[in-house]
């Protein structure tokens, strides 16, 4: 399968500014590639990472635009984006995985990551620790009265500082070596609906209308 890809010269930032990739980025756009022979998916290499403060997410730029073309039958293809397995080692995730790049999209391929730990929550807890600590100081309580409490406050503050550092650090580097996710291109077979007059025309099945866990857990049949 041959797919058209264009290495962009410029990319648009969240601020609306348009920057020159060659001048602004440390690495130039890199074509997706298979990591090993026989791999189903190609790895994607990011060239720039932005933090979207409003939505508390990281956006990775690839500097690539695609025309993913048609399948052998002339039907449109679709590109699926999937997280890499090493993402399970962190608290980050791709919120819309598997993501879909439709046949007609000609813009830059962007990858989004969020952290399961809200940055706002970390800030709130850290602020609470500071408030309690300041209250203790203003009340002029002796250390003998608040020894254990003070130690616990310090432990909480240290924990929150470490968590905030992790939350603020993007999951992948943009050094031309880190791979942020993977892609695969499939045929998006066209669907046409055949409406029937009664539910019986759908036919019978062992599961029937059992859903949301109702259809599992039964004894296996011999």
State each model region's role.
Residues 1-222:
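DUTPase catalytic domain/fold
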């Amino acid at each position: 399968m041959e797919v058209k890809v264009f290495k962009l010269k410029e990319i648009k930032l969240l601020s609306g500014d348009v920057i020159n990739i060659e001048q602004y980025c440390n690495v130039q756009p890199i074509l997706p590639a298979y990591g090993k022979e026989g791999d189903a998916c190609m790895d994607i290499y990011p060239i720039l990472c932005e933090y979207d403060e409003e939505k508390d997410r990281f956006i990775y730029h690839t500097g690539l635009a695609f025309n993913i073309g048609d399948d052998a039958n002339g039907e449109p293809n679709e590109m699926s984006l999937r997280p890499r397995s090493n993402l399970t080692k962190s608290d980050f995730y791709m919120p819309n995985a598997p993501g879909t790049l439709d046949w007609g999209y000609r813009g830059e391929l962007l990858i989004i990551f969020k952290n399961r730990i809200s940055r706002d929550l970390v800030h709130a807890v850290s602020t609470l620790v500071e408030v309690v600590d300041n209250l203790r100081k203003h009340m002029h309580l002796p250390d003998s009265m608040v020894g254990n409490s003070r130690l616990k406050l310090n432990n909480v503050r240290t924990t929150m500082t470490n968590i905030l550092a992790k939350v603020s650090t993007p999951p992948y580097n943009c050094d031309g070596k880190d791979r942020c996710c993977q892609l695969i291109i499939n045929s998006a077979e066209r669907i046409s609906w055949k409406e029937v007059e009664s539910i019986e025309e759908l036919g019978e099945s062992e599961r029937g209308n059992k859903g949301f866990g109702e259809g599992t857990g039964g004894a296996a049949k011999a």
